[in-house]
Each structure stands twice: as structure tokens, then as C-alpha cells.
Amino acid sequence: MTTATSLNELQQQIRDRYDSLSKRLQQVSRYVLDNANSVAFDTVAVIAERADVPPSTLIRFANAFDFTGFNEMKQLFRMNLVEETASYSDRARLFREMESEAVPETPLDILQEFARSNAQALQQLAARAEPEMLERAVQLLADADTIYIAGLRRSFSVAAYLTYALSHLECRPILLDGMGGMLREQISRIKARDIVVSISFSPYAEETVMVSETAASVGARQIVITDSQISPLATFSDLCFVVKEAQVDAFRSQSATLCLVQSLVVALAYRLGEGK
């Protein structure tokens, strides 16, 4: 079992393993599933008291899911709470309230932290890239009649860039933007010889999941870019690129995802050029 990287992933692991846990750990399971805000904000002592278990049981619970301690597990609850806060101002305030250490606040501090974190994320992307997956992704794009691209909310900028870049090649890219509330009408045109590129990160956009479900139902090939192998999008994918983005405080970057997308487009340009 791999360590969960999002709250949704952890909650699914807890539900899947619930029956195999001891009674004490089942007790903790029920509490953490039903009281996400408490786990995010409260101390270990308070959580243990409210769950009616010794603090050591919380540590055993975290260890059972491959965390080094309960505080490490708490981070998933805290970041999920922050991510569900739409306002960036409220998000920054929440993070300061939850963070015991000093939070970088000057523009230079924030720039340096993002630069450092993005550099690490890009190095990790290159180190973990699988040549066969990249080759297959480029070939799927080259063979497609039409390339449908789905990426909403914070993933929209990546989807829009991919559409823009592909429009400069001999491709037929279509951005599934749901303009005028017509997403269902847009995706109804997807056919078996098309490719769907879906981009979404936790918390996953329901509309993007709907696109993947529809594409699967008509037999279209799918390339997914997401943050977990158990992302709801991964189920429908022919190729799934798991990208770990840089994160500074409560804010995630998009540098690694954009790097991957740009690399695929440029590789496709070379591939199409060879065919002339």
C-alpha cells in the first residue's frame, strides 16, 4: 500500500480496510471520517479525547496507513480544508491559523520558495518520466481524428494552453470549456477515433470526471494528467501521468504540468514533421 497523498485517497483507503482493522482502529476510522475539520484543527490530545482512545492509538492508526506519525496524516486534512476554500485571502488566513511555524509573507520570500519548490518538482518529473508512456502519448495524439481537452477550475489554464499549442499543428483540438452550460452537448460529439486529454487534481472537478466517463462509454482513448493513481480519472485512462506539483503554503503551482504538456506538444510537432 502506498501512502495517500490526498484526503480523498486516504478516506478511500480507510473505507477499503475498515473491516480488517482492530476495534480500536475502527473507532479512530469512524471519527476521522466523520470529523475532518476537527482532525485538521485540533491537537492530538483533543482528537484522542473526542475519539475516546489513547493518543498512542492515533499514532498506531497513522502507522497502519504508512505515515510516520499522526501529525503527518493531519496535513492531508489541513490541506483539504484549505483547498476547499475558494477565496485566496481566506485560504492564506486559514493556513496562518493552522501553521505553527513562520509563514513566508514578503514577496521575495514567496518568490524564492516557489522557485525552489518548482525546481524540485521539475527534477522529479524528469526523473520519474517513463519513455514508453511519453512515446505512446505522442502516438495517440498523432493518430487521433479530434483531440478533446478537458481541464476546469485551476486546471483550465493548462487545458487552454494545450489547445492553443495543438492548434498550431496539423491537429483538431477542441477545448471542452462548457461555455453557456453546454458541456454535455460538447462531449456528445466525442467518437471512438478521438482522443480525450483530461487534466484534474484533487479536489477533482466533477465535470472533468463526467467527460472521462462519457469518453469511456464511446470507446475513445484517454490521456489523463492527475495527481494520484487512484484519482477518479485514472480509472478511465489508457495513459495516466501522475504529476506531483510544487506547493507553497496553501497554494499549488502548475509548472510541472505545463512542462509535461509542452513536452508532449513539441514531441508531437517533430513526429508530424517526420511524416511529411
Placement of each model-derived feature along the sequence:
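Active-site phosphate/pyrophosphate-binding segments
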Residues: R136, R271-K276
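HTH-adjacent hinge/linker in prokaryotic transcriptional regulators
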Residues: L7-Q11, S20, R24-Q27, N37-F41, ...
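Short, acidic loop-to-helix structural element flanking the phosphoryl-transfer center
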Residues: E130-L140
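Flexible phosphate-sensing "switch/lid" loops adjacent to ATP/NTP-binding sites
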Residues: R15
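Glycine-rich phosphate-binding loops that contact phosphosugars or nucleotide phosphates
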Residues: A142-G273
